């Protein structure tokens, strides 16, 4: 339950999760994201990644290891997610949680809008299908990385209703596709 998660992890009601450990994102940038969210009365918690040692620059953090269901609930009950990995992005979209994505995937390709070959990043493809490229950047194109003020604005301006509608549409499309496959 939400109460269980809030109590177990000692979370404030208005919390945002940040999970950025790529070397191209500075500790200063991450700390400034925390400051900007605090101005809007949100507490930022560092969500650790299983495959990387965490940078300890934020005031609050979730301790690792995390039970998979608790990990899911941490995202589900949050007010926002700022991070780089695909699975938390999917979890956020599934629950219409506002997000800002820092994509670390993809092969660089000149003259592409986000500095990558769009077909080489699953995160880009997902965010693009949801129409959320304003909430997206790629480390392969450093100029696309938003300022902390822009990140907070993107998260707070997130259209949850549009996200829910798109998720439902994609679920319907998937179910239709699977039904068509089963009819063959």
Predicted segments with their positions:
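Active-site anion-handling motifs in enzyme catalytic cores
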Residues: 1-184
